[in-house]
Swiss-Prot record:
Gene symbol of the encoding locus: patr-1
UniProt region (Disordered), positions on chain: 279-313, 398-427, 492-549
GO CC, any one term: P-body
GO biological process entries: deadenylation-dependent decapping of nuclear-transcribed mRNA; determination of adult lifespan; P-body assembly
UniProt record similarity statement: Belongs to the PAT1 family.
InterPro entries (UniProt xref): Pat1-like
Composition-biased stretches (Low complexity): 303-313
Lineage: Eukaryota, Metazoa, Ecdysozoa, Nematoda, Chromadorea
PANTHER family: PROTEIN ASSOCIATED WITH TOPO II RELATED-1, ISOFORM A, TOPOISOMERASE II-ASSOCIATED PROTEIN PAT1
Name used for this protein in its record: Protein PAT1 homolog 1
Sorted UniProt keywords: Cytoplasm, RNA-binding
Amino acid sequence: MEEVKKYGKTLEEIEGGLMFDDFPESLVDSDEDHNIFDDEFDAANDETFGGGLDNIGENAELENYATQTAKLRFDDPVWQKPSSSDHVAPSASEIPIPFPNFGNGDASDSFKSSFEAESPFLKKSIWGNGTDGAYNIWGTNFGISSVPAAPTLDLDFGALLPTPTIQATKEVKSSQIPSMPSSALTLEDCERMQMGNKPDSLVDAFKDLQLGSTPVQPQSAQFSKHPLEARIAAPGTPATASSQALPTLPTAALSLEELELQIMKEAQILKGRQQVPSDMREDNKFSHPPPGFNQNVQPRMDPSLSPGGMHGMPPSMGTSMPHMGPMMPPQNMQLPRLPPLNPQFLPLIPVWFNAIINNIQLPMGVPPPPPFLFQLLNHYRNPQLVHAMIMQSSIPPNIRQNGPQFSHPSGPHSPGNRVQRKHSGMPSTRTIYDLALDSFAGYMSYKEREWLIRIQFIQCKGSGDPQVDDYYYVTWRDKQIANGWTAETKLEEATKEKKEKSSESQKDYLERISRMNYREMQKERARERDKERQRERQERIDRGEDKKLRQTLSDKFATSLGLPSKSSTHNPRHVLDMKAQVESVDNQTKKLSDEERKIAVAKKLRTMLLRLEGALNILMEVDELRRSSLPEKSQFKDLSSDEKDQEVEKRTTVIINELMGDDLSKLMQMSKGRAVITRTLKVVEPRDQARIILALMTAGGLVSKKMYGEIVLDILPVVYQKVSNLHPDQFKYLVGALNLDTLKRQLLDSNMFIRDMMMTLFFVSVKNNQQLVEWAKATKFSSLKMPSSAPLSIWRKALSVISDSEIKEFADDIKYSGIVDCHDVAQLIEQSL
């Protein structure tokens, strides 16, 4: 019992000594920034593949561990006294989690210890000790070291796992644990005694097993022991003679190679299921745990995704778990509290992070990043975590979203893609996207802009020499002084203006006041107009010109619903008017508003244009039918000449019936409509040509006078060509079909189109020896001179194919024809030359 008290230790001291006493000195003495995960280890050695298991019994410290802990007694009073050992057990929070990938499923396990750690920054105020305002976040006294510059900020964003902080334990005097009595109980025996179970014979047999002579270990023996015992007692178990007789292995047992193969296959299948897309990995720049934040915890894997054969597998068995995304705190987890930040600065936090991390220039109008952001990033090394802490501390819970949300800006306008968006020949990488913040974006670089601003500042300051700074004004002023002008001070000008105002009359004063008050002036004008209207109305009433019939109340409200009216037995009050009233189209058009009228006109114009497009397509088919040789792909290639003529007649008849009716006047006022008319005249037969000419002369009276010139220039040349080619009988039929009354009325209305058409018919009749002139003389046809005496310059321009000599002969024939106003008409013809 005395021997047990002499070497008595607590369980924490024993576990701490086993975990930290033999820690490699090279790692203890190394720098904290050294990342042991970056070291390369050679796997092709005897240690990895079990080549040194034969000499494992040489370690006396582990060899005697079973005998040292054989007779431990928890009811002994020595466990209640402080330990006299020099070994100090570390805190439980500093012990690494054995298997972090197979936890209890609680997502907050990985974050509790880090958030509960003491931080020197959290004890300070982000507003500073020397600040005067509540929102001065750019103070200088923070109680911590000075703020580092943005380029030197050491944010380890490239490492997969954080740099672990290795804590060196106390230097031990001896690397060996003193031997314990052989009768001491082991940890396993103590557990069995507490549970009320007896020691297992299989475990006793396993203790005496010689590990060096056994290539394969039964699977049941691997998992029958406690993990701590399997890790501590197995390597140091001494070999005995009785251990050579091994128990027979079951037929379904797996060898070490087969077990390793099975584990690797399952890991590959799991890795394929959980493969993260490449675009997601590129967009999330902060997808790893922050250094100093949950240092000894690997990414937690969802237990539901792990295969059945991998439960309880330690990380050292050769399989590497796939990366399961960023280590971010759960949504409802309470983060460390910071002093609240002004809400107006919350939208600027991502902009400041981008400027600090990417070392880019801040947009115009954005203040510089406050110093506390540098300190938070230096402490936590995770922009996502810092952003979540600030947002949780600054936004009330009732309006805050669940969990911190922070997404790094990405896309074509992100800072990382500005180099890719630079256009060739442009001095800047910024485009029109940045014009809202910088009017010089895309035209000059930042340095060029600074240089331009400096030059402008220098120009604004001036050199002090008026001849250099403002040469033109100085020259002009010298000339004015030379001409007798004297400069007056502002005080003298104000005094002079005041005198002018004081000397103004009452009328001038009222005019000036009325100009100053525009509303009063408008009201006064309205009152004057009302007085003028009343005066004119009274004058008309006095003259008897404006006597309105007095309308009784009954007549006014008759046939009105719900309004009083005089009723009797013979004339009852009309509650509802049952008479059918059909308003005309003109009345409906008048009721339309200006906007509705515009919409209606636009619809009609669109319909007319669609009809013209259809007519042009038909004319193109007619031109194709008129060709002597048709292409191979033509749909009319197999038709005979008679069939082609029939197809042409069908199509021209459709155009004449559809367009040469009531809508012809509208077509004549449209350039595309006139093109359809002229093309139709060129392809139809003479009989149809006469029909079209008669329709044109009938619709000419409905055309606006402003369009006469354009209509004559477009239509008259084709009409002259086709009328000249008519047979005398056909020409006689055309003249006989004219409506004389309509023509006379249109000539009296100074219709230039009808005058020019009749002048063309007279010219063709004289040229072809027709009797039209004699017919006009006999019928006393209206004069072509017209009351307005409009010149024939447009008619002559339209008939430019006729020579001047022919025009002179035509003028002489008209002069001696004996028609009405023959001399005046001949004079007009000669003036057109």
